[in-house]
Amino acid sequence: SNGEMEIRIDSSNKHKAAFGILDMVKAGQYEMGHSASYYWKGKDVNTMFFTTMPFGMIAPEQYAWFYYGGGMELMKKVYDKHGVYSFPGGNTSNQMGGWFRKEINTLDDFKGLKMRIPGFAGEVLSKLGVVVTNIPPGELYTALDRGTIDALEWVGPSLDLNMGFQKIAPYYYTGWHEPATELQFMVNQAKFDALPMHLQKILTIAMQFAAYDMYARSYHESAVNWASIEKEYPNVKIRTF
């Protein structure tokens, strides 16, 4: 944009509201935000469909749906009522089933288990007796380490090792619940509409490129970190539900 548009990035350490990003963008406190659509299920259950579904689409299928199968139009219909322009914001690829302090051997082992897991997966596990909670990313390690929760699902090898979960939870389960997880850019609709047309196009193209880049990087880093788990963390036991 030759300096016409600058984007300042604030982490949750500054705004202190990891689960309030939609509200902040809607209110104009931030012109733009980045998160995951399924966090807003308490406001509108339809938002969950734009992130992932258990046994649902993988990333290439999601992008085909968004751009050529009517997904963008459905997302616009849901977010128009919030005054927000929503756009695909990057994909983690298939996610792991979570880190557990104790091994899961039977369905009874889920009863009373305190676990951080969002979206449709949380709804499913709650039916099995799991006490589902949603904790901001910056608090996950401490919560698991102190036993505030018994298990958590975050992303996968691409990001989990950076969080250090392999140091405190010996059981790492493969996933079923998020075959691909699409994140979300949100732009205050009034602010977006006020931009000159060329800046609207630049921002849209930049978001699309960032989404593809995140997907490629996540896919690569998951493979690299998976190999690291086997070599550097022999204490971690890979399990399948």
What is each stretch, according to the model?
Residues 1-62, 72-241:
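N-terminal secretory/targeting leader peptides
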